[in-house]
C-alpha cells in the first residue's frame, strides 16, 4: 500500500469518527459528571470556611 492510499484511508476514518452525530450516551455521561462536579463544589463551599476557621483557631 502506498502512502497516498494509506493517507486517504486514515483521512476518511477521521472524518467518519469526528463527523456530527447525535450526543446520545455521551450526553448522559456529561450530565452525570456535571452533577458530580456541582455536588463537589457545593460541599467545598460549605467545608472551606469551617477548615479556615479551624486553622485560625490553631494559630
UniProtKB/Swiss-Prot annotation:
Cellular component GO terms, alphabetical: extracellular space
Gene for this chain: CECA
Triggers of expression: Up-regulated following bacterial infection. Expressed in adults within 6 hours after induction and accumulates over 7-10 days.
Protein location: Secreted
Entry keywords, A to Z: Antibiotic, Antimicrobial, Fungicide, Immunity, Innate immunity, Secreted, Signal
Pfam families: Cecropin
One GO-annotated biological process of the protein: defense response to fungus
Source organism: Aedes aegypti (Yellowfever mosquito)
Full protein name: Cecropin-A
Function per UniProt: Antimicrobial peptide. Antibacterial activity against Gram-negative bacteria E.coli D22 and D31, E.carotovora, K.pneumoniae, P.aeruginosa, S.typhimurium, E.cloacae B12 and X.campestris and Gram-positive bacteria A.viridans, M.luteus, B.megaterium and S.pyogenes. Possesses antifungal activity against F.oxysporum, F.culmorum and N.crassa, C.albicans, C.neoformans and S.cerevisiae. No activity against Gram-negative S.marcescens Db11, Gram-positive B.cereus, B.subtilis, B.thuringiensis, S.aureus and L.monocytogenes, the fungi A.fumigatus and B.bassiana and C.glabrata.
Tissue: Hemolymph (at protein level).
Family matches, as InterPro entries: Cecropin, Cecropin_insect
Signal peptide location: 1-23
Primary location recorded for the protein, binned into one broad class: secreted
Proregion residues excised on maturation: 58-59
